[in-house]
Amino acid sequence: MSSSVLVLTSPGFASKEESLKKVFDLIDNGASRELQMIDRVQSQLVNLPINRYDSVIAAIDDGAWSSTLGPILSQAFASVHPGGTLRVYSTADEADESFEMTALLSGWLIESKSPWILSRPNQVEAVPIKLSNKNGQSASKNKILDFLKSDKENLISGDDDQELIDEDELLDESAHDNVLKVPECKPEPGKKKRACKNCTCGLREMEEHESSKTSAQLEAVKLTDTTEVDFTEKLKSKNAVSSCGNCYLGDAFRCSGCPYIGMPAFNPGDTVILAENRDKMSWMADDI
């Protein structure tokens, strides 16, 4: 049976009749040959058949082997039979540095570098091997299955009466002393619990939340004609704000727009009815 050879060449090389004739002289007389242009294979205008050729000859006229042959090495690899070869014929001196790596990544084995000949490895066939024991006797298939089955049963089946170990009993007293404890804001005996300066336990956030909640409730209070309000209650709160802060001392200490003008001084904590004050303010306005 005659061998089949694929010749891959560049258009520039194919235009040189003498160079192309030298490539054809490398092929046996009885072999069938096929000529394809490399650029047409690169652009996929031509698809190479799978496992068809016994060998491939790549004829190029430049040293940029990776850019010219690199894109088609995988297709050429698939087009030859296992054990087939690819020979590079070039008018350039030698291949560029990356061609060897490109060829290896495409699956080729490097047989020679002068001239460059690549080969496709033969197919590896799986061969069944009979198992044998130490005495040279073949191992019984049933014995192997029984052995695997017994291991599986031992793994699944467990002793329900087996006593469980308490993990805490494995620790001694020294291990309990070294347990990392979360820092807390502990007050001195007889004092209220407050957040410390570098609070990390969350107490400071809780205090700020409660304080803002109380302030919001106090701001929501609206004075009406009959509203009874403890004036000092707001002043006692942590975030209380007053224009003068001296309304309870008397008119001499009150602002010009204070609602308590005309009223006598009162003690902090006294309940003040604003309705009476409003009547006095109206009477004072009439006199003015």
Curated annotation (Swiss-Prot):
It comes from the Eukaryota. Residues 1-127 are annotated as: N-terminal SAM-like domain. Monomer. Interacts with tah18. Interacts with tim40. [4Fe-4S] cluster binds at C244, C247, C255, C258. Component of the cytosolic iron-sulfur (Fe-S) protein assembly (CIA) machinery required for the maturation of extramitochondrial Fe-S proteins. Part of an electron transfer chain functioning in an early step of cytosolic Fe-S biogenesis, facilitating the de novo assembly of a [4Fe-4S] cluster on the scaffold complex cfd1-nbp35. Electrons are transferred to dre2 from NADPH via the FAD- and FMN-containing protein tah18. GO terms for biological process: [4Fe-4S] cluster assembly; iron-sulfur cluster assembly. GO terms for molecular function: 2 iron, 2 sulfur cluster binding; 4 iron, 4 sulfur cluster binding; electron transfer activity; metal ion binding. A motif (Cx2C motif 1) lies at residues 244-247. Belongs to the anamorsin family. Residues 244-258 are annotated as: Fe-S binding site B. Its main location: cytoplasm. GO terms for cellular component: cytoplasm; cytosol; mitochondrial intermembrane space; nucleus. A motif (Cx2C motif 2) lies at residues 255-258. This is Fe-S cluster assembly protein dre2. [2Fe-2S] cluster binds at C185, C196, C199, C201. Keywords: 2Fe-2S, 4Fe-4S, Cytoplasm, Iron, Iron-sulfur, Metal-binding, Mitochondrion. Residues 128-177 are annotated as: Linker.
